[in-house]
Amino acid sequence: MHPLPEYPRPSMRRDSYVNLNGPWDYAITQSSEFPAKWDGAILVPYSPEAKASGVGRTLQPGQWLHYHRTFTPPAGEGGRVLLHFGAVDYACAVEVNGRLAGGHRGGYWPFTLDITDLLRPQGRNTLWVAVQDPTGTGTQARGKQTLRPGGMFYPAQSGIWQTVWLERVPENYIDTLTVIPDYDARTVTVKVHTSKPGGAVNLWAVVRAGGVTIAEDWGSDEADRKSV
């Protein structure tokens, strides 16, 4: 069973969801290079500083925290395969099968990488994440994290600390979805952005209460639709 097995983004749940939480190989080194050996296993999505991770070590400025695991892509064919990170503190680079998939800076924001073109058509795939967290030495937002906890400050947390998951989507898929209810006007405004805006994509919005449809409307991507 995965830690935190629930779908992390219920407003855009897809059936192709594959949870990558669980044991990963890890190593803490002084280099950004792929480690020659692994220090053991870390339980993602808990930071190495947390007891729940099974590690209990503090990542120091200048050190690199490496994660590694194998995975099988979501079932199905065609479309795109997206790799989602709920959050990684602070800066990271991600490789799939030895090729750079992308990176991210900022410890509090989710990010997504399209890894379709990096996948092997058969067999298992490898995922490597290299992380740095210059707590106390950089200009990044840190809240109350510090390497010298005390008073209102708590120990710094590093690395992957939110769910990691895969999903398979169509070539043109819903990228962002915003639902704005207006109780007084008795309307719901639905804002949908697709991955390839401007295409001839029809969208259908349905509002249900207790299993009963109370409103529905059609529209196109990049357009607002109000259901009354």
Task: Outline where the language-model segments fall.
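Predominantly extracellular/luminal regions of secreted and cell-surface proteins
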Residues: 20-45
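Structural beta-strand segments of beta-rich domains
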Residues: 81, 186-192
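Accessory beta-strand-rich segments of carbohydrate-active enzymes
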Residues: 5-11, 25-31, 57, 61-174, ...
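N-terminal helix-cap/turn-to-beta initiation motif at the start of protein domains
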Residues: 12-21
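Short, solvent-exposed loop/linker segments at the N-terminal edge
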Residues: 180-186
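Conserved small/polar residues in nucleotide/adenosyl-binding loops
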Residues: 227-228
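N-terminal glycine-rich cofactor-binding segment
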Residues: 48-56
